Amino acid sequence: MWVRTTLTIERWTKEKTEPKARSWDEALSDVNRLPSWERGHLLAGVASSTDVSTFSEGGDCKEPDKCCWRHKQCTGHIIYPFASDCVRHSLHLHSVNHCNCNSRLKDSSEDSSSSRGAGPTCSHVIESPCFELTPEEEHVERFRYGWCKSYRPVSVAVIHHPLYHECGADDLNEEEEEEEEESKPPIPTQVGPATASPDLGTSMATGTPDSTAPITIWRSESPTGKGQGSKVIKKVKKKKEKEKDKEEMDEKAKLKKKAKKGQLTKKKSPVKLEPSPPDVSRSLSARQLARMSESSPESREELESEDSYNGRGQGELSSEDIVESSSPRKRENTVQAKKTGAKPSQARKVNKRKSPPGSNPNLS
């Protein structure tokens, strides 16, 4: 304890004995010399009745200082880290501001040089969200056993995720990228008829290229161009293989369905009946039927064999008649032959009938 007191006394005496030029005077301090992320904390203690023009009257950071002053007027709308406010509990390592205050700060830091350090870190690296207040009814009082006793409209914070914000540093980076692109030499591309190379050693052994055929050279600026082309080819191959597999599966399913349908139709279809023998009663006459009924079974078999033989002969004759009917010339010849053969017989008969009776010599 005694050591601590002596140390504190020594430090206090040293600070008091220092010259006045080196002492830090609050009246002569300039807000512009402080880093941009510390200004808000220092300006928070200043009364709101003071004029903004009194702070940072000159310098590059005039506009950001004014913006910080306006922004610190929103002190009532800040949710501090790991604190609960507006029915929300903040789990962020940084404070969450109201969206109106946040947008004002970003707009004022766009055209200023001081936004190069604070702007990108706050908007892109940290990605601090903002919130808006909406009135909702929430329970205010509770009973001892936990149920709500009374409700009241309370402003509830609705968190909004941050959007990409363009700062002065982004504009500088874009300008640098444009200058680098302009300084790069253009990539040579040849479109049109190819000229023959003067070196004969470099020519192909198979033959010289056609000079009339246009040649287009495609070059990818990115180093991963070849890998992307191979990936695309692999994807196309995989798609084709999948389509083939699907087609094979569909064909197999169709064959299975057809086999099942065939089995069902076989089960449902009735048994094929044997063709019934021709009715003998229709082909036979009444007399033959009577004979068959009276005669023995052996005689019936003989009669049936005779009838079948006669039927075959009739069938053969009918086929011959069909052949004759197919040829009209033969038919006419046969008709004429029949007519010529019938006429002399009729004439003979007529002569026999018309011949007068022979005269008897006795009567004369």
Swiss-Prot record:
Record protein name field: Protein PROCA1
Polar residues: compositionally biased ranges: 203-223
Annotated Basic residues bias: 232-241, 254-270
Span list, region Disordered: 172-364
Expression sites by tissue: High expressed in testis.
Family membership: Belongs to the PROCA1 family.
GO biological process: arachidonate secretion; phospholipid metabolic process
Ranges of biased composition (kind: Basic and acidic residues): 242-253
One Pfam family linked to the record: Phospholip_A2_2
SUPFAM superfamilies xref list: Phospholipase A2, PLA2
Record keywords, A-Z: Phosphoprotein
PTM-bearing positions, type Phosphoserine: 276, 308, 318-319, 355, 364
